Amino acid sequence: MLRDGTRRSYSLANAPYQEGGIELHIRHMPGGVFTDHVFSTMKEREILRFEGPLGTFFLRDDSTKPVILLASGTGFAPIKSLLEQAFFKNNTREFVLYWGARTKADLYMQDLPEQWALEHSNFKFVPVLSDATSQCNWQGRTGFVHRAVMEDYPDLSKHQVYACGAPIVIDSALRDFTTVCGLPEEEFFADSFTSMADSTPR
């Protein structure tokens, strides 16, 4: 919250077991009151007021179903928190993370899930770019991130899905996963946020 009372909501990126600070992933939105302040005028040790944590985006421990994690852009933040907590608790469920972004540069922490895949046999990472260019020499998946999930998992009837990102991405995933892939609607958990720069699916 800014001094004038302006509020913005962000998902926590650090896991519940981690102490010592709050980690947020904030994308600079030129013209945005809060992000302009953060990236241009906010000073080190400046005091901000926080409220929370709020929301219901956490791993349901009462299930053993394999988990599909869907992130778009900085929607990776709460996915990171969820996974780090699961790894800390030695959760043995199968986790597959699909992280969608426009360009390779937007996969701003790509090394981290790649490292998780090396360290945890029950975790797989699938990055997906919607606007891959020849300059980035991308050899991975392309297109909309939720459609990459559907290509790999045409039957989601026995899965749980955790998704975070722009509303258009979350809404598309919920609609298609439930109507086309047989995902029970009660097994879809989301942390959706609004961003003018994220107005098209990834």
Region roles according to the model:
Residues M1-E46, R102-T103, L129-D131:
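Ferredoxin-reductase
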Residues P66-I68, V96, Q160:
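Structural motif
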Residues Y98-R202:
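Reductase modules of NAD(P)H-dependent flavoproteins
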